[in-house]
């Protein structure tokens, strides 16, 4: 039993180290693409601003209408409140990962006590 617990701890340590180091290397390798660098505004000889392809003024009216119709729906998503009885508390408590750790710890304690008594 102790051998299995030791191997499990080694696995957790190795896994957490691999996740930690892979996150560090991924974050350091990310570079800002040249397309997304801030651009200086361009002006023509008449003093009018030259529109870029991604400017909101340059987007066709059909596409602008689509985004305007979607924005109220997106804003209302956060405002919708579900009733408290939508999901029973027993299901919520089973889905909580903190309770999984507590339950596993309690089961391990019971197992160790049973081994010591037996």
Curated annotation (Swiss-Prot):
Keywords: Host cell membrane, Host membrane, Membrane, Secreted, Signal, Virulence
Regions of compositional bias (Basic and acidic residues) in chain numbering: 35-65
Protein name, entry field: Secreted RxLR effector protein 143
Signal peptide (from-to): 1-18
Region (Disordered): 35-66
Membrane is among the record's keywords: yes
Protein purpose: Secreted effector that completely suppresses the host cell death induced by cell death-inducing proteins.
Span of the annotated motif RxLR-dEER: 49-64
Organism: Plasmopara viticola
GO CC annotation, single: extracellular region
Entry text on domains: The RxLR-dEER motif acts to carry the protein into the host cell cytoplasm through binding to cell surface phosphatidylinositol-3-phosphate.
Major subcellular site: secreted
Localization of this protein: Secreted; Host cell membrane
Keyword Lipoprotein found: no
Sequence similarity: Belongs to the RxLR effector family.
